[in-house]
A protein has these predicted regions:
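Conserved serine/cysteine hydrolase catalytic core
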Residues: 159-232
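Short beta-to-alpha linker loops that shape the active-site pocket of alpha/beta-hydrolase fold enzymes
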Residues: 33, 57-60, 67, 125, ...
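N-terminal cap/lid segment of alpha/beta-hydrolase-fold proteins
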Residues: 1-14
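Flexible "cap/lid" loop of the alpha/beta hydrolase fold
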Residues: 120-152
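Conserved HGGG/HGGXW glycine-rich cap/lid loop of the alpha/beta-hydrolase fold
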Residues: 13-63
Length: 278
């Protein structure tokens, strides 16, 4: 398997990226708060025989350089665009956005729509979540998990460093200032580009806050006329860790639909029992 790790200069930042495989369209992974490329390597390796996969450390995380505080999703999307240019990645690409990475993936699509072939949103944050959820906290569990996963051995131990933890908290606080006006895309803006939205499971008890979270994700599914919304019944916020095959299948289905033009309603090959349709 062809794997290349490098650092590229994008504006004031040195950004670390690893590229797996060599088929097109490329799959580009945008991690969660504090997430590093390494947390997605297992997924990237599994896809490398079918697509070129770009996993990068969003500044200031992982092996990338420090970045200014409170950058906007559009600034982060422009950084990603610079990374793809520096790596010579052809467009359009399939974007995979996890948690806050979903906001950044949509910001990228808002700025560079013609460079997006499809999208997978993995328990994505939503620009209106603060207003809709108001004091209900299921989506904030993602932050707590980002801070505790290193202790479980699921993310690099360096995330226990104070500087990285402070960066996660700053990014989290910046996300709280997002409003509906910050949405880069309206329903239908992705046209018929394939889109799969994955939502974490409700847990042992279905709480009204989870239902609101699911409804926000149903709204995200309306960005494309060629979309699916699936609930990962057995997963927490880190679906790519708890149900990796569901995430892999979603990415493969979006790739297939982007390549062939066959709608997801006909192409979905998800194994029974791995998630429920919404």
């Amino acid at each position: 398997m062809d794997v290349k790790t490098t650092q590229v200069q994008v504006g004031p930042h040195r950004i670390a990226a690893t590229v797996f495989g060599d088929a097109e369209p490329a799959v580009v992974i945008e991690p969660a708060f504090g997430g590093s490329a390494q947390s997605w390597f297992a997924v990237a390796e599994a896809l490398a025989g079918q697509a070129k996969v770009v996993a990068y450390d969003r500044a200031p995380y992982g092996a990338s350089s420090r970045a200014q505080d409170d950058r906007t999703p559009r600034e982060i999307a422009r950084d990603l665009h610079g990374v793809l240019d520096a790596l010579g990645i052809g467009r359009p690409v399939v974007l995979v956005g996890h948690s806050a990475g979903g906001v950044y993936a949509r910001a990228f699509a808002g700025l560079y729509r013609d460079e997006v072939a499809g999208m997978v949103l993995v328990d994505s944050a939503h620009e209106a979540q603060e207003q809709v959820l108001r004091g209900q906290l299921p989506w904030r569990v993602g932050l707590l998990e980002a801070l505790t996963l290193p202790m479980l051995g699921l993310l690099p131990a360096k995330m226990l460093n104070g500087a990285d933890r402070r960066s996660i908290i700053r990014e989290f606080r910046a996300s709280k200032r997002l409003t509906a006006a910050d949405r880069p895309l309206a329903p239908g803006d992705l046209g018929d580009r394939p889109l799969i939205v994955l939502t974490r499971g409700p847990g042992a008890k279905v709480h009204p806050s989870w239902q609101l979270w699911r409804d926000l994700h149903a709204e995200l599914a309306e960005l494309s006329t060629n979309s699916r919304h699936l609930v990962a019944d057995d997963s927490n916020h880190y679906i790519h860790k708890s149900e990796p095959e569901l995430v892999l299948t979603a990415i493969r289905d979006v790739l297939d639909s982007a390549r062939t033009g066959v709608p997801l309603s006909q192409a979905l090959t998800r194994a029974p029992g791995t998630g429920s349709e919404r």
